[in-house]
């Protein structure tokens, strides 16, 4: 602990108007000042603190300077590294975090089903500009419509769902707006068949749809085509003939029409 020497007869009288002012001799114009220079921590050893007289101006009281020196001396006795290195940070982390092995688990499909499904409304016409209409409760047909009959054209609700991870195409399901009917692919006899299937609107559409409802949408310039996810290389198709049912076919670019124009509608 630093100590302030006791006053003796050899010490001169000083006066000051303010604690923050310099100390001057009471009887002379020499204006001899007394202040303490901050110690160099690198030079401090076991010998204690060395007080020095300096001619530099400090706007601090003598009591404040002595308190600062005592505090600096206590800090100088603390053990510390000159540079903060990576090992120091690693040691801190080891005290806070505990390393444990990470295991991966496959999530149940229920969580995927709860995900929000993004959808849009659209109309589809084949390359011959035939529109799709609902000919009976569960049959879609493609035919040319006159202007006064365009209200018969089916509006699809296209929902974006989960597909195979290894497939880069866009998986979608196609439902009829406000009818709870969805296009699906089923095997009838020995041939995949396209049909309309009614679903509970409280449960569908959902992110993880059954594979028979899923189609992979591919865009080719300004046209789109829809391939069955359950039956690869089978596509939603229309006939070149008028007023025939929409079906599932394999003849791309042949007699059957597999490419469509899509008109996106506002919600």
Swiss-Prot record:
UniProt subcellular location: Cytoplasm, Cytosol; Secreted; Lysosome; Secreted, Extracellular exosome
Pfam families, per database record: IL1, IL1_propep
UniProt cross-references to Gene3D superfamilies, sorted A to Z: 2.80.10.50
An example Gene Ontology CC term for this record: lysosome
Record-linked InterPro entries: IL-1_CS, IL-1_fam, IL-1_propep, IL1/FGF
Statement: the UniProt record of this protein carries the keyword Calcium: no
GO biological process: cellular response to lipopolysaccharide; cytokine-mediated signaling pathway; fever generation; immune response; positive regulation of cell division; positive regulation of immature T cell proliferation in thymus; positive regulation of T-helper 1 cell cytokine production; positive regulation of type II interferon production
GO molecular function: cytokine activity; integrin binding; interleukin-1 receptor binding
Keyword Secreted attributed: yes
Residues at the site labelled Important for interaction with integrin: 169, 177, 179, 188, 202
Domain of life: Eukaryota
Role, per record: Potent pro-inflammatory cytokine. Initially discovered as the major endogenous pyrogen, induces prostaglandin synthesis, neutrophil influx and activation, T-cell activation and cytokine production, B-cell activation and antibody production, and fibroblast proliferation and collagen production. Promotes Th17 differentiation of T-cells. Synergizes with IL12/interleukin-12 to induce IFNG synthesis from T-helper 1 (Th1) cells. Plays a role in angiogenesis by inducing VEGF production synergistically with TNF and IL6.
Family, per entry: Belongs to the IL-1 family.
Subunit-level organization: Monomer. In its precursor form, weakly interacts with full-length MEFV; the mature cytokine does not interact at all. Interacts with integrins ITGAV:ITGBV and ITGA5:ITGB1; integrin-binding is required for IL1B signaling. Interacts with cargo receptor TMED10; the interaction is direct and is required for the secretion of IL1B mature form. Interacts with HSP90AB1; the interaction facilitates cargo translocation into the ERGIC. Interacts with HSP90B1; the interaction facilitates cargo translocation into the ERGIC.
The protein's name in its UniProt record: Interleukin-1 beta
